[in-house]
Structures are given as structure tokens and as C-alpha cells.
């Protein structure tokens, strides 16, 4: 782990003061951390300000903090909130940078090799580099991460040792700087200037760090000495100011110096010889030939370029690790005494525990059939016990802590009172007969009051059918499914809050951390279908989605009341009783949360254009909308005639959205 010398302080900026039972929760958590307690649970009901409590704790204990969330949507939301609370500190975002990812795999039954295929999101890659560089430069850092943080990342020591440090007056030739940049995987491109690239114009070298997306640095030489360094606008070249020191971090997290690379290549060759001998002994000549060809190509690429596709599969040799030794991860970039907070821990812990086995079974197949060396098995996520070995102090945060958390600690700090005085919603059970028409009436009542609705179903088909039906009924509705890209998810939540649409339908995406105060109705279909999505914890989480609005109401559609339903209803009633008593004692009238609607993370231009298109539609008058519907109908017919039914369906959905505005 990395240790720092700097001693920056966290500075919490908020117009709020702790209220309700937040002050006691903050005090207990801080006292326990300062007293050396390793693990504790913050059991906070939905909407009680758990994120604010977490921020207060981080500010008071002043430790670098890793906040782990179980999905990218929740991580994006937390990132936005922490950035607002800590504008002067480094708040970073670290999730998987793949918009699409098909891992390398082999299916022996059909003799099918599936090559790794992926689409990397440039914005998220930039944020990942920003996170690791911040951890090496300062100690006032909060990293909000998904479970990606337990996957192999490359050695933090190699990463830190590879930093190119520049300052005015430094004696270094221009060519030496260019070589140093190439060594840390920067690419020279004098025409297309992007992140992770540099360009040269005479005695001027312009460098675009991997952790930036708008600003680059211009290094001006006088002979073999740096004359000055300027920060510039990458697009226009406008000078923003001069800098006294510039640290250029590697353009990739998997970086190795020349000496270590030679040692690594020797080890890869030795392992290749061993594995070829094993295959030949077993009569697996095809596998031996395949492995020899692939590995020798990779070795040649590593020797000539210092990099190859799938370089992470050789990370054990490049890091100098022993067989079976855990890989370096984001956790190794933190100092020894850092703090971990696991948000929605009842979900996140399950993911941390399950990642290793799925990865292992896929890679074993690749090794057995000669697609990878056995050392590829050590490019993997951490096991649960390996993750635990990184834990110095940890806070599990959840409205419904799981069995694992309760086994780790008996220290449970409850936070039930909401600062706004909001109560847990009233829950009622209605029969399934006529449920859709009943629900339609409830939605229309909310639309009239400019309130939003969440609907959770059990199957993808039901969610799609329900969405189509409500569109036909003139409801502005969207379906949030698992195929939606990372940054689009946060945009959907934002659009719901802005009123671009009124109803959001989903399966398992609505339960934890989707923070929409405008939602006053949560409808749970098939509430009596006992299982993962309808157990006690799941139902309590779903009920909590309506707890941020003073008109919050939950309808469970079911023909019988299961034990899980009853326990969830009873727990909600218990909390509601405590909250009502507190409000009565302090003369508090419940008020819906007023929360600023903001862009959580900068989105791509394509998404921005799409958003502009939606804004234009809403600004059209009735006659213009009528003409637009006619045009869309014509386009839909043309798409059907050329058998492009997918396009036709998209146009149909757009048409229904326009009609819903009337």
C-alpha cells in the first residue's frame, strides 16, 4: 500500500446541520473509528441522510476513504453527492470502463473460441486514471467505486516509479522526455491530440495526461533545459497559466520498466516451455501449437512495444508475484490506515464474495485448451478473505444489513429519523385482479400532481409489455433495463426528476440508492412471489423508494400475504411509529426533500445531442407535434417496408412519446 507525506484536511461544505438521530450516529461512528474498532454497521432507513452522515464521518476522521457501491448507477449518484459535499478535496470515480464487454472464453462442446471483445468508455477511463493519480499525489481523497476495485490493476509501485516529474529549470533533453513518455505508454500523434498522447513542434512538447479531457500541458525547452511549463486548453491552445511542477502519470495502469520487462519475458518463456511439455506428454498437440503461437506473438509485442492486447494475463510475471498470490488492485493504491465504507452492503458484499469463482471457471477452460498460460489464472478479482486482509477499518451501510455484516460485528448504529420529518410510507396490499387498470388510475392521479411513479416487475417481458401498454394509454413512461450503458442510467434518473417522463418501470434496478424525491408512488407487482427480489430485505428496500416524499405510498399487488411481505410491512410500521413520535415531540411537519437536479458525470456528446432532441420535442406547440407524428408515421412505414423492424419499433416509441405530450 502507498503511504503519503502530505496532510491535507477534508473540508465539508453543506448548508445543512446534522439533525434527527444523525448527530448521535456521527458521534458513535467517529468515536468507534478513533477508538480503533475495525468494523461497524450504520443501519439507516432510506432517506435518513446516510450519505451526509458518511460525509460527516469522513470529514471528522480525516482518512482517505474508499466507498464501494454495488452498481454503476449508485456509484455515479454517490460520486455526485460527495463532490458537492467536498468541492475542495479530491472526489474520484472508479468503475469498470467497459460499455460492452465480452470476455475471452472457450466452449469445448462446439469447439468455439470467443475472442475478447469490448468497448471502452473514454470518459470513465479518464476518471479511473484521475483516481489513481490523486491517491499518489494527496491524502484528502474519496474514491467512489464499484466492485471493479477488487480486480487486478497493476503494481502501484511500478505506477508511482514510472511517473515523469517535470519542473522549469530541469536539465533534460527533448528527446529524453519523448523516450520517457513512450516508456509509460504515451503515443506520439502530431495531428489527433487526445488523452494519453503527446505532440512535438520544434522545442515545444505538448502532453495530454490520461486523467484529463480538456486541459493539456505545454513544455517549452531552451536547449537541454525546460524553460517553462504552461497549462493550455487542448482544443484551442489558449494558455490558462504557468505551473511550477508537472507529474505525468502512465497512460496505462499496467506498466513495467525495461529491467522488469526482461525478467517477466524470461519467466513467460520458461512457463511456456513447461506448459508445452505438459501438453505434449498428454498428446494435446493442437493445444500445444495454439499456445506456442499465441504466447510467442505476445512476447514479441512485449519486447518491441512494451505492451500487448491481453497484457493483464501476464500481470503475475510483470508484477513479480508468486503463483496464487493476490493481484494488485485499487486497494493497494491507498495508504495503510484508509477507511472503507460499503454502501448498500447487503448487496455489495454478495458481489465481492462471488466474483472470484465465476472468473476462475472461465479462465480454467482457456488454460486447459491452450489459449492461455496457467499464470493467467492469477489475473483475477480478490477472494473474500483477500479483500478482508486489506481492511483496516470498515463501515457497512445499509437499511437492511445482511448475515455477513452481522457476523463481522455486533456494533450496530441505527439511524431512523429523517431530517425532513418524512415518515416511512404507508403500505397497502391490493388483489392482482384488475391490477393494471387500478395502477393506471393511481399513475394518472400522480401525474396531475406532478409526482413520479416507480413500478417494479419480476420479468423483463412484463416490464416491456407494461411500458408499451402505458405508452399507448398516453403515459410518459420509460423502462430501465440491464442493457442500458453506464452513463445513460444517471441521465434516465435525471430525466425522471426533470419530468421528461413520469413513470419508470424496472426489475432489479429500482431498489437501492435510486434517489428520486419526486416519486410518491411505488407499485410492487407479484409481491407474493417469494424469492430474491421479493424477500424481506428486497421489499423493505423497494418500500424505501417512496420514503423521500411526504405523499409517499406503496401498493403491493398480491393475492396472499407471504411471511416476507408481513415482516417488511411490520418493520416499516415500527419505523413509522418511532418517526411519528419524534415529529410529535419536536413539532415537525413532514416535508418532501428538495434536492438539486444536477449532471452527475459529464456525458458523451451523443447523449447530450439526444437530450437536446427531447427538449426540442417538449417545446413544440400542438400543431408542430401533429406534423411531427405524421412524419414519424411515414418513416415507420418505410422502415417496415425494408424489413427494418428494430428501427420501426424505435420510431414507434418516439411517436408514442410525442403523442403523450398532448
From Swiss-Prot:
The keyword tRNA processing does not apply. Keywords: ATP-binding, Cytoplasm, DNA damage, DNA excision, DNA repair, Excision nuclease, Helicase, Hydrolase, Nucleotide-binding, SOS response. GO terms for cellular component: cytoplasm; excinuclease repair complex. It is found in: Cytoplasm. ATP binds at residues 44-51. Residues 626-661 form the UVR domain. Gene3D superfamilies: P-loop containing nucleotide triphosphate hydrolases, UVR domain. It holds the Pfam family ResIII. Residues 31-188 form the Helicase ATP-binding domain. The keyword Flavoprotein does not apply. GO terms for molecular function: ATP binding; ATP hydrolysis activity; DNA binding; excinuclease ABC activity; helicase activity. GO terms for biological process: nucleotide-excision repair; SOS response. Residues 435-601 form the Helicase C-terminal domain. PROSITE patterns: HELICASE_ATP_BIND_1, HELICASE_CTER, UVR. A motif (Beta-hairpin) lies at residues 97-120. HAMAP family: UvrB. The beta-hairpin motif is involved in DNA binding. Forms a heterotetramer with UvrA during the search for lesions. Interacts with UvrC in an incision complex. The UvrABC repair system catalyzes the recognition and processing of DNA lesions. A damage recognition complex composed of 2 UvrA and 2 UvrB subunits scans DNA for abnormalities. Upon binding of the UvrA(2)B(2) complex to a putative damaged site, the DNA wraps around one UvrB monomer. DNA wrap is dependent on ATP binding by UvrB and probably causes local melting of the DNA helix, facilitating insertion of UvrB beta-hairpin between the DNA strands. Then UvrB probes one DNA strand for the presence of a lesion. This is UvrABC system protein B.
